[in-house]
C-alpha cells in the first residue's frame, strides 16, 4: 500500500503529467516496489502511466553493476514513452564491470573532523572495544548491527539511507590510521557518484546525510538518460 506522503507526491506528479503530457516520464524508486508487500503500489503506478497514454519499461538495477559505483544500491527505474517508436527503440543499459574501489570514494589517509570519529569517550561500555577488536582492516566497510560488527564482504558500501546520519546500524564505518569513523557527508555523495569537486550546500550534517541517502546514483541515471536520448532521436 502506498504511504500517505508518497501517494500525495505521486498523484501531484500525475497531475503534472496529465497537464504537460511530456514525451518521456522517468521514475526511480526503492527496489521493494517490486516485492510482494508493494506489488499493488507498482500496479497503480504502471496502470496510471498507461491511462495517461504511456508505454513503459521497468527494471531493477544495482549501482555497482550498472553505474561503476561501489555501492550495493538496487533501485527500480521506470521509463514511459508517449510515442510508440520511441518506446520500441529504448532498452535499459547493459551491466558494466566495477572498476572503482572504496579508495576512489573514501580518503582513508586523510584526517577528517573529530566529530566523525568513534571514541571511547563517546561510546561507553564495550561497544567501542568491540569495534576496535573486530574492525581489523583499513580498506573495508563495516556496520554496527546492534550487537555485533559486520564486514561488508562485497567490498562496496551498503545502501545509503536517509537516516544514516542519525547513528545506529545504518552507518557505514571505516577504520583509518586516525581511528574508527563513519563516512563524511561528502564521502556519501561520492558514493552516489557525485564528483570530488561537488560543493556541498551550507546545511547541517543531518540534512546532508539525508540528501545523500535520498539521492540517486548519478552514473546509472546518466546511462539510462543516454539510452532515452538515443531512442527519441
Per-region residue spans from a language model:
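Class I S-adenosyl-L-methionine
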Residues: 1-159
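C-terminal target-recognition/interaction regions appended to catalytic cores
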Residues: 122-233
